[in-house]
UniProtKB/Swiss-Prot annotation:
Keywords tagged on the record: Aminoacyl-tRNA synthetase, ATP-binding, Cytoplasm, Ligase, Magnesium, Metal-binding, Nucleotide-binding, Protein biosynthesis
The protein's name in its UniProt record: Lysine--tRNA ligase
Domain of life: Bacteria
Location(s), subcellular: Cytoplasm
Gene expressing this chain: lysS
Organism: Hahella chejuensis (strain KCTC 2396)
């Protein structure tokens, strides 16, 4: 078997060769210096001078100090990449001193180098820096993935995200957009007098959502603690304390399964506004998401594609955040997407059970009418909500923290926001009646005792806070990861989390 047939042998040989070159650099006192300071980024140079002619550049006598990772070596040209883009360096074999030329011979793909010199244009019209005093800043001991194939193993892209970011411009752009999304949300809210808060990640009582928590132990306090599943109850304590507009962008943790839409550690924005209701937050959310799309993408039209196994685009859909968002109640949406049904089929237990059974939904004895309606909704409606849509009036049975509707106590003043068949946000007018909240907590405790690991705990301190009086308030949570998935046309949540959770590799 030749070396070309065994990648492991090839890589070991390359690593040995690179270690030898590093040894020579150490002997010369040139290993891992930290005394170069660039004055230009690649993309900035391309933007400012890329359209200049050779003659214009020579006349302008522009000089630059650049640094980056070697991505290609083509004869006398070296292509480097920094955080903004790429530019070429030119090795002037006649103009450089012999000692510097010898050092350049120690360069390999993946090394981090630096140089200064005049800007020129090649005969092909490419911008380059005519290197003076070329420097090897970091010797890469391991080779980069094949320049044509890249890091093709999806799982390895997640495990070795640093290589994915080096070799995959699409991945870098995804995380630039993610950063811009968070930045624009923060800007939008702070400009509207919201205060950013930080609430506990370790909690004695995990609350604010129905989910299974991660359990840990605090040795000094000698108590069991939980990684938070949501910041909600602490943020509402702040509303009680007088912070009438408050938000938090941070991680939540839920000890549940992995999927293309679920990661046990994920990022959310939660925000609360006193003297507002769920309709006010729907208006705010519509305005904010329109702003975020424009800021992050430069457009309110979000393109998503479907691809075949070869990666070819076979279908495309545009989610239009520029148009007014659709608004329907849970019941209206069920009837809209199931035209064969009537209101009489789903507004009573017998009818709803019959519909659910016909859909193959396994019923549980503890379910009431509201829970069955939601199961029908999730089975027949949720995945069909493609354009930006608010679904409102969720049953009280499945909304333990939301305020009951004044006209119909069977439902709450709650909405969820969907686009592309995905739930992105959940918001409602907050329940601020301490006695009603205590009763709902008791029902959750009963469900937990009956075996529901995701049911809520009874949070007595939160009830005490409500007894001091929380103003009429509306609150909302938006899943940052799912929002970024949508905006970047990413099929998996792992594509938008820098270091997603993975099963350990087998020995």
């Amino acid at each position: 078997m030749t070396e070309n047939q065994n990648p492991a042998i090839d890589e070991n040989k390359l690593i040995a060769e690179r270690r030898g070159k590093l040894g020579k650099l150490r002997e010369k006192g040139l290993a891992f210096p930290n005394d170069f300071r660039r004055d230009s980024y690649c993309a900035d140079l391309q933007a400012r001078y890329g359209d200049k002619s050779k003659e214009e550049l020579e006349e302008a006598s522009v000089r630059a100090k650049v640094s980056g990772r070697i991505m290609a070596m083509r004869g006398p040209f070296v292509v480097i990449q920094d955080m903004t883009g790429r530019i070429q360096l030119y090795i002037d074999r006649k103009g450089l001193p012999p000692e510097q030329l010898e050092n350049v011979k120690l360069w390999d793909l993946g090394d981090i180098v630096a140089a200064e010199g005049a800007l020129h244009k090649s005969d092909k019209g490419d911008l380059y820096v005519n290197m003076e005093n070329p420097r090897l800043m970091v010797k890469a001991l391991r080779p980069l993935p094949d320049k044509h194939k890249g890091l093709t193993n999806t799982e390895m892209r997640y495990r070795q995200r640093y290589l994915d970011l080096i070799t995959n411009e699409e991945a870098r752009e995804t995380f630039r957009i993610r950063s811009k999304v968070i930045e624009s949300i923060r800007y939008f809210l702070t400009k509207r007098d919201f205060i950013e808060a930080e609430t506990p990640m370790l909690q004695v009582i995990p609350g604010g959502a129905t989910a299974r928590p991660f359990v840990t132990y605090h040795n000094a306090l000698d108590i069991e603690m939980f990684l938070r599943i949501a910041p909600e109850l602490y943020l509402k304590r702040l509303v009680v304390g007088g912070f009438e507009r408050v938000f938090e962008i941070n991680r939540n943790f839920r000890n549940e399964g992995l999927s293309t839409r679920h990661n046990p550690e994920f990022t959310m924005i939660e925000f609360y506004q006193a003297f507002a209701d769920y309709k006010d937050l729907m208006n705010l959310t519509e305005e904010m998401l329109r702003w975020v799309a424009q800021e992050a993408l430069g457009t309110t039209e979000v393109r998503n594609t479907s691809k075949n196994t070869d990666g070819d685009v076979v279908d495309e859909i545009i989610y239009d955040f520029g148009k007014p968002f659709i608004r329907m109640t849970v019941v209206e949406s069920i009837l809209h997407f199931n035209p064969e049904l009537t209101l009489g089929d789903i507004d009573n237990m017998d009818g709803a059970k019959k519909v659910a059974t016909g859909l193959g939904i396994p019923l549980k004895a503890s379910w009431g009418l509201g829970k069955i309606q939601i199961e029908i909704f999730e089975k027949t409606v949720e995945h069909r909500l493609m354009q930006p849509t608010f679904i409102t009036e969720y049953p009280t049975e499945v909304s333990p923290l939301a305020r009951r509707n004044d006209d119909n106590p069977f439902v709450t003043d709650r909405f969820e926001f969907f686009v592309g068949g995905r739930e992105i946000a959940n918001g409602f007018s907050e329940l601020n009646d301490p006695e009603d909240q205590a009763e709902r907590f008791r029902k959750q405790v009963a469900e937990k005792e009956a075996g529901d690991d995701e049911a809520m705990f009874f949070d007595e301190d939160y009830i005490t806070a409500l007894e001091h009086g929380m103003p009429p308030t509306a609150g909302e949570g938006i899943g940052i990861d799912r929002l970024v998935m949508l905006l970047t046309d990413s099929p998996s949540i792992r594509d938008v989390i820098l270091f997603p959770h993975m099963r350990p590799l087998a020995d």
